[in-house]
Amino acid sequence: MNVRAAATYLSDRYYDPLMTASRAPAEPTVREFEATVERVDDREVVLDETYFYPESGGQPADRGTLDGHLVDGVVERDDEVVHALASDGDVDLEPGDEITGLIDDAFRTYCARAHTASHVLYGAARRTADDLGYAGFDISETKVRVDLTTAEPLGDGDLIELERLANRAVWDSLPVSWATHSADEAREIDGIAFNTKTEEGAMSGGDAVRVVTVGAEGDPWDVAACGGTHVENTAEIGPIAVLERSNPGEGVTRVEFAVGPTAIDELGGVHAAALDAATTLDARVGDLPDAVARLRDEADRLEADLRDAREELLGARLRELPTTEIDGARWAVGTVDDAEPNELRDPATEAVGSDDDLDALAAVGTGNAPFVVVAVTDAADGDAAAAEIDAGEVVGAVTDEFGGGGGGGPTFAQGGGLDADPEAVAAWLRER
């Protein structure tokens, strides 16, 4: 077998060697069956045999009815499959009754397709990721997740390749088969590896292991120990759409994907979005990356021009602030509208540095959160008056008087959260 070496896709049912009392995994196409009631405990029913799949290993329980009674849940307990009936209505079943079980065809079909799709996706990951391992699996109403451990995080390109390879495996109509082996026999299958946790106890001795093979026996797409229900050919899966990825833990990449209507809607939505974007950018869909790159470059240039223009505007506002003499130094003090403190650092420093008659500047920002910035001419330039001013000390005095907090150095400091009218703060600075 040419399955790329990787940790086998294993069910979460580590307590059981992937065998179940249900006949569903062995005969997944059965939707109606006859059985005898063995035991009834309140609303829980045990049959002599069942084709209902019990919730296990990330695959949800089958839905359906037992002689018209809605089955609300199915679990395996003490090597028995227990059917929990819905709470509405009386349970008129008794031990010895011959009953008919009906399995919800749509939901079983969805789960089988989704479960096989997860094996197909894992097979694709075998061909794209190094040091691949399996960390979890779950089927929900609209999507499936597979948790992979990889040497490096999976990127966008990896997801695209996973989706491409998985859909190619679907198109290639690969057979899907399953067989039961002893644990020792299973270990000898090329390309299959057992999780250490699985090997401890449950996988020892002559325990039976159910092995699912996707593809031809001599050259399979994937080989996995699994107890779920599956389709008999990958063509039955239909389109596979990768939805997103996340990182739930160190070294783990969670890949979420969809099959069926959700996948069709996702792929159609992506195509529609691409067409809309292409129309907006006057480009072909295949040329979108280049068109977006050009647009991004243009946006970056415009943003830089806007920053420069705004800095010039703020500088002009600061140079228009009224000046006053405070302790022998020439100050520009006033309020500034529509500005953020970080935006004023360079314009304020430039304003005091370019005016030989100005020693310091204090600008009070208006708005819901008043702030103050103070810039002082560098004393190294020979300004004796500026040498007596410490911007950080001035901001500290402002926050002591009006609340808030801040800090900085001798030539520039800022403070925010002032609990006062900006004009009152500016007046206090002029008079201090």
Regions found by a protein language model. Name each.
Residues 2-432:
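A glycine- and charged-residue-rich anion-binding loop/surface
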